[in-house]
């Protein structure tokens, strides 16, 4: 029995039964003691269906007898299925795999170019890498990024078989990335070459030492007064007070009790007189309508003719009624005047009360807000000027040490070369060379202005009594004048007695012609004896210092 229409035979109506998933597509489900079969829970067709509906799958639905089942099972690899808002990146040398190999577990972003291509851009160690994403990978990234941040992160080998997982970059990840960028070392300062120092006076030398080049990077976080929130709070308070003033004025003009008109008063006497006259005229008119109220005249024929004059009693009655009406009108006028004044007083009192309340609440509060806001602005400005931000300075110091040889140029003051030759030791000892150079310099420099203040440099110079060249017969040997006209600097060389522990010789005398004469006489006389560091070479001088260097200590001349 055929298991299904594998060959697309139209004569076979059998459908394809659900097949078990491939082992690589179950994420190790088969190793958990659950048998994979076509009817079990792990053999459900849902394992073959991606969690999301991708565009790549929808285009291939017609290629299968079962709708929704893709043709190539590799389409359902682990990287296709999202789990916990992430998916695996297979080692398939695809764009995401290539980007992961370049930047590792770092953040990358997705951008869309003008031509419609989607690229993923990541950075590591200052090198930016970008790859062009396929439509399927871009769809995967969109499926796990519903908010559209377009920022993702590789979370290392957390997937199956060491695959990296791709998840949406959280705020913590972005903060970590920014911290790492801030912690990257900026450039160091430029160091200058050493050996550029110049000599001082007649002694020119290239100093041996260190040069410090300091590069100072200053970042000052300054903020203007307008960026201070307290200033805007104070200005807002002032604005609120101004608005309160305007609102109070509008309310008082529209909503309060209007200003009452002046009360209309009527003169009671005028009202009484007018009423009395009107009543008299009205009653008189009515009385003339009745002929009985008129007096009658009898003519010659004896006929009664109305005379047009009211009877006296009728006139008296009319006058009485007119006075009564006038009195009543007077009283009514008095009462009306009193009511009008009362109404005016009540309305005026009510308005004043409303004005008092509204002014106290509106103008008072608004004025307080304006005053407080003004004080706040002044205080904020003062504090801003007082509390200026401190500059944050980062100093990078680069030290370059260069050792150079010392070059000494001797220039005697009298332009006269020193008598004799100076024996300097070899170059194997730097300190010895320096001492010899300084001795040579000292031998050619002298100051005639300080002869009287020069201390005796030979007071403690010692010599050995075992030297065969030292005469022992005479303890006091005179220094002969060698034909020089200069005065003798030291008259004698005194040797100590043999029973004393001090075996050194002592020069006696006072300096009178300067150190230069002493050097000249010592040079002419053959110099000092052995163990005293002879200065010049001669037949009677000590052994050359290049062959027999002087001993350190008090036996050194210099």
From Swiss-Prot:
Changing residue 460 to A: Does not affect translocation into the host cell, ability to bind intimin and pedestal formation. InterPro entries: Tir_central_sf, Transloc_intimin_rcpt, Transloc_intimin_rcpt_C, Transloc_intimin_rcpt_cen_dom, Transloc_intimin_rcpt_N. Residues 1-44, 182-226, 257-280, 388-451, 533-558 are annotated as: Disordered. Signal peptide: none annotated. The keyword Phosphoprotein applies. Phosphorylated by host kinases. The chain crosses the membrane at residues 231-251, 363-383. Residues 1-230, 384-558 are cytoplasmic. Residues 404-424, 538-548 have a biased composition (Polar residues). A motif (Essential for actin pedestal formation) lies at residues 456-458. Residues 182-205 have a biased composition (Basic and acidic residues). Gene3D superfamilies: Translocated intimin receptor, central domain. It is found in: Secreted; Host cell membrane. It is a multi-pass membrane protein. One of its GO terms (cellular component) is extracellular region. Changing residue 461 to A: Does not affect translocation into the host cell, ability to bind intimin and pedestal formation. Residues 252-362 are extracellular. Belongs to the Tir receptor family. The intracellular N-terminal region contributes to the initiation of actin assembly and influences pedestal length. The central extracellular region is involved in bacterial intimin binding. The intracellular C-terminal region is required for initiation of actin pedestal formation. Multifunctional protein that is required for efficient pedestal formation in host epithelial cells during infection. The extracellular region acts as a receptor for bacterial intimin, allowing the bacterium to attach tightly to the host-cell surface. Simultaneously, the intracellular region initiates a signaling cascade in the host cell, which leads to actin polymerization and formation of actin pedestals at the sites of bacterial adhesion. In strain EDL933, acts via the effector protein EspF(U), in a phosphotyrosine- and NCK-independent manner. This is Translocated intimin receptor Tir. The gene is tir.
């Amino acid at each position: 029995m055929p298991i299904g229409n594998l060959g697309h035979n139209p004569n076979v109506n059998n459908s394809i039964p659900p097949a078990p998933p491939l082992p690589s597509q179950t994420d190790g489900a088969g190793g958990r003691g659950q048998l994979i079969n076509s009817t079990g829970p792990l053999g459900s067709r849902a394992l073959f269906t991606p969690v999301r509906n991708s565009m790549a799958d929808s285009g291939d639905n017609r290629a299968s007898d079962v709708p929704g089942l893709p043709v190539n099972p590799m389409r359902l690899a682990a990287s296709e299925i999202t789990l916990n808002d992430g998916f695996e990146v297979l080692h398939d040398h695809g764009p995401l795999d290539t980007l992961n190999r370049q930047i590792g577990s770092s953040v990358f972003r997705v951008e869309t170019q003008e031509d419609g291509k989607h690229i993923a851009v990541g950075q590591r160690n200052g090198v930016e890498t970008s790859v062009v994403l396929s439509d399927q990978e871009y769809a995967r990234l969109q499926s796990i990024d519903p908010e559209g941040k377009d920022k993702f992160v590789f979370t290392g080998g957390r997937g199956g078989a060491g695959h990296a997982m791709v998840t949406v970059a959280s705020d913590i990840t972005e903060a970590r990335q920014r911290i790492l960028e801030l912690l990257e070392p900026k450039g160091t300062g430029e160091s200058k070459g050493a050996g550029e120092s110049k000599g001082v006076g007649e002694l020119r030398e290239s100093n041996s030492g260190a040069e410090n080049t300091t590069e100072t990077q200053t970042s000052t976080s300054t903020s203007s007064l307008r960026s201070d929130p307290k200033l805007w709070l104070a200005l807002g308070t002032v604005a609120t007070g101004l608005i309160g003033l305007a609102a109070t004025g509008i309310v008082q003009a529209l909503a309060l009790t209007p200003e009452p008109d002046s009360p209309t008063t009527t003169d009671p006497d005028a009202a009484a007189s007018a009423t009395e006259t009107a009543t008299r005229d009205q009653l008189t008119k009515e009385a003339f309508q009745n002929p009985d109220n008129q007096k009658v005249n009898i003519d010659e024929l004896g006929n009664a003719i109305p005379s047009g004059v009211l009877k006296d009693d009728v006139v008296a009655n009319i006058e009485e009624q007119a006075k009564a009406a006038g009195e009543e009108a007077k009283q009514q006028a008095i009462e009306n005047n009193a009511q009008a004044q009362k109404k005016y007083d009540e309305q005026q009192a009510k308005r004043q009360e409303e004005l008092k309340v509204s002014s106290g609440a509106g103008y008072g509060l608004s004025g307080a807000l304006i005053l407080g806001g003004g004080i706040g602005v002044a205080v904020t400005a003062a504090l801003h000027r007082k509390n200026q931000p401190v500059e944050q300075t980062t100093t990078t110091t680069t030290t370059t040490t260069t050792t150079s040889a010392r070059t000494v140029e001797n220039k005697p003051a009298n332009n006269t070369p020193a008598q004799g030759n100076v024996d300097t030791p070899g170059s194997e000892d730097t300190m010895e060379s320096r001492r010899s150079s300084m001795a040579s310099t000292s031998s050619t420099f002298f100051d005639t202005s300080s002869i009287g203040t020069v201390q005796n440099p030979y007071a403690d110079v010692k010599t050995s009594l075992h030297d065969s060249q030292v005469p022992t017969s005479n303890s006091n040997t005179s220094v002969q004048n060698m034909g020089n006209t200069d005065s003798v600097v030291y008259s004698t060389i005194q040797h100590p007695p043999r029973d004393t522990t001090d075996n050194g010789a002592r020069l006696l005398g006072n300096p009178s012609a300067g150190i230069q004469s002493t050097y000249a006489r010592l040079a002419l006389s053959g110099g000092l004896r052995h163990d005293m560091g002879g200065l010049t070479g001669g037949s009677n001088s000590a052994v050359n210092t290049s062959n027999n260097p002087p001993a350190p200590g008090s036996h050194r001349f210099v």
